[in-house]
Amino acid sequence: GIAVAYALAILDSSEIAHPPIEAVFTVDEEVGMLGAAAIDVSDLKGKLLLNVDSEDEGIFTVSCAGGATATCILPYNKDMINAKIIEMRLDGFTGGHSGAEIHKERANSNCVLGRILLNVFENIDMRIIGVNGGEKDNAIANLSEAAIAVLPECVDRAKEIINKVFDEVKDEYKVTDPAMKITLNVMDSQLVEAMSGPSTLA
């Protein structure tokens, strides 16, 4: 809002000296830069873009920044296997805004989940059933979930690896994320559809 008012005030004034100005106003930026993605810039002539933004009242940040959203579609194969299911939930992370708080070096629950899954996969026969890491583009994730399938005889080893890696991470981020925790739920053996071994690795 302040940037809109600022630009309109300059354009309306006959006393403020300035070069030619093109004011661009878009909407739906906090939910995914939708306005910026849809705008037709072919009529714009300016060579310098200024963005007025800030997270703190009374402070102007005059800059230019951009963002990119990548959509990755990975084909994968599924198998029906008889296995136990380990559900894991990582939460209690501090999280935050990826623009305003990225410099605070907080843990990202999605990155931690990936680290855990990789370690389990490297040590036992594990298949991914599903993962969920949230939907926000501009967030340092604070909650992640996954379900994996493992052979009954590998459950204890899997839990040992999961807890070991999580303890390492918790120690690394003990200052920024003191409340992070992991919850494991082991379900009885059953016939379950899960990613194939190569697809899990990918």
Question: Model features per residue range: what roles?
Answer:
Residues 1-30, 86-90, 97, 104-120:
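Alpha-helical metal-binding/catalytic segments enriched in His/Glu/Asp
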Residues 70-73, 84-92:
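Short amphipathic
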Residues 33-39, 60-65, 100-103, 141-143, ...:
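Short acidic, glycine/serine/threonine-rich loops at helix termini
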Residues 78-85, 139-141:
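Flexible, low-complexity linker/loop segments at domain and module junctions
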Residues 26, 53, 75, 91, ...:
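Solvent-exposed residues in well-ordered beta-strands and their adjoining turns
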Residues 47-49, 54, 62, 66, ...:
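Functional cores that coordinate and move charged inorganic groups
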Residues 1-77, 127-129:
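Acidic/histidine-rich catalytic neighborhood of metal-dependent amide-processing enzymes
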Residues 110-202:
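Metal-dependent amide/peptide-bond hydrolase catalytic core
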